[in-house]
A protein has these predicted regions:
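Acidic, Ser/Thr/Pro/Gly-enriched alpha-helical scaffold modules and adjacent low-complexity linkers
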Residues: 2-350
C-alpha cells in the first residue's frame, strides 16, 4: 500500500483571534510556491468573510483538497477561530479527501496537536485506513476513482444549455481551452468536474482546474497546458481571451466562442446530429447519468472509427493527412472537425 498511496502531504492553516491566517504545520513538506497558492485558496486569508468548508483544485499536476472548520468551544485550540486542513495528492477524488479531511479536522479540534494528524495521515499512507471511535473512520478502499469521475450530472448540464452543449462537446473533443465563470465556488466545482465525462474515452481529469485565481503564476501554469477546463469566480476573466477558446458564463447560461477559435469550432450537420443525440438522451427521464454518458461515448466511438478508417493502410500506424480528408469531400465544418480531432487524438500527419 505504501508504494501506491497517491497522497503527497498534509498541512494546517490557522486563523487567530487577531484575524491573521498563518501556515503553521506541514508533513512531510511542500514547496514555497505551493504553500503560497494554498494560503490563497483556503478562504481564511482574504477580505471576504465567506468560509468555504471544502474546496479542491489542481496546480502543476498536484491536486489539493482543503477542508475548513470554525473552532467550536470547548476545544484544545485557544486563540484560533478557524483552521484549514490541506491535503495534496496525485489523484482526483474530492469525495475521498473530503471524508478524510473531516476525520483529521475532528482529531485536531479535539487534541489541538498536529502530531495526531500526522498519525492518521501515516496510517492511511501505510494501511489505507484511519480508525477512531470518537472522530470517525476512513477507509481508502471505499473511494473508487471511477465513482469520482461519475459524481457530477451530465443531465443537469444538458438541461441548462440544451443544443449549445454541442459547443462544450466540440471544445472538449478538440482539446480547446474552456473557461467557466460562476461567483460561487461550489457551483463552479460541481459544473467543471462534470465536463470531462463528455469525453469519456480519454478518462482524463488532469485537464480540470476547477478553482483558479487571476494570479500570474497560476495563469502561467495554465498556459503550459494543451487544453483544459478552468473555473474562475472572478468575472474579469472574460477580458482574458488569451486563456480561453470557449467561455461559459454559468450565471447567464451563456456559452461564447472566442473570435480566434470560431473557424476551428465551426458547426455543421455532424455537430447538429451529435447535439440532437445528446439532448435526446439527456432528456429521457428513464435514463441515468451513467446511461447518458454511455450514449455520448458510443457516438464518440463511431466518430473515432470513421477517423481510423481514413488511415491509408490498415496497420493503424500510418497517419491521416489533410489531402486524405479532402479526397472524401466532407462538408467544410465536418472536414475541419475531423482534421482537428485527428490532431487531438495524435492521428494526424503534420
Amino acid at each position: 500500500m505504501a508504494g501506491t498511496c497517491p497522497m503527497l502531504s498534509v498541512g494546517l492553516v490557522e486563523k487567530d483571534t487577531n484575524g491573521d491566517a498563518l501556515w503553521v504545520w506541514c508533513y512531510p513538506t511542500i514547496t514555497a510556491e505551493l504553500r503560497e497558492l494554498l494560503l490563497r485558496k483556503c478562504s481564511l486569508t482574504g477580505e471576504n468573510d465567506v468560509i468555504h468548508t471544502f474546496v479542491f483544485g489542481q496546480f502543476r499536476r498536484t491536486w489539493y483538497y482543503i477542508t475548513t472548520t470554525q473552532v467550536q468551544d470547548p476545544t484544545a485550540l485557544s486563540k484560533v477561530t478557524h483552521f484549514s486542513l490541506v491535503l495534496t495528492a496525485k489523484d482526483f477524488n474530492p469525495e475521498k479527501y473530503a471524508a478524510f479531511g473531516r476525520v483529521l479536522c475532528r482529531t485536531y479540534m479535539k487534541y489541538g496537536n498536529p502530531a495526531r494528524i500526522m498519525e492518521g495521515y501515516i496510517s492511511v499512507v501505510t494501511n489505507g485506513i484511519c480508525q477512531s471511535e470518537e472522530n470517525g473512520s476512513f477507509f481508502t478502499k471505499d473511494y473508487d476513482a471511477k465513482k469520482a469521475y461519475l459524481a457530477g450530472s451530465v443531465k443537469d448540464i444538458v438541461s441548462q444549455f440544451g443544443m449549445e452543449t454541442i459547443i462544450l462537446y466540440t471544445g472538449l473533443m478538440l482539446k480547446k481551452r474552456v473557461v467557466v465563470y460562476h461567483p460561487h465556488i461550489e457551483a463552479l466545482q460541481e459544473f467543471t468536474r462534470t465536463l470531462p465525462t463528455f469525453i469519456w474515452h480519454r478518462q482524463d481529469w488532469s485537464i480540470l482546474h476547477p478553482y483558479m485565481h487571476l494570479n500570474h503564476d497560476e495563469l502561467e501554469a495554465l498556459k503550459a497546458c494543451t487544453g483544459y477546463v478552468a473555473g474562475f469566480t472572478d468575472l474579469k476573466v472574460i477580458d482574458r481571451p488569451d486563456i480561453y477558446d470557449v467561455f461559459v458564463n454559468l450565471v447567464e447560461s451563456e456559452i461564447i466562442i472566442a473570435p480566434h477559435a470560431k473557424e476551428t469550432m465551426a458547426m455543421g450537420k455532424l455537430h447538429k446530429d451529435i447535439g440532437q443525440l445528446i439532448v435526446q438522451s439527456a432528456g429521457d427521464p428513464d435514463k441515468s447519468d451513467g446511461r447518458v454518458i454511455k450514449d455520448i461515448s458510443q457516438k464518440t466511438k463511431e466518430i473515432l472509427t470513421i477517423l481510423a478508417s481514413l488511415r491509408p493502410d490498415e496497420d493503424g500506424k500510418s497517419k491521416i493527412t489533410l489531402e486524405i480528408l479532402k479526397e472524401r469531400h466532407f462538408p467544410p465544418p465536418t472536414e475541419s472537425f475531423l482534421y482537428h480531432l485527428a490532431a487531438a487524438e495524435q492521428m494526424l500527419q503534420i
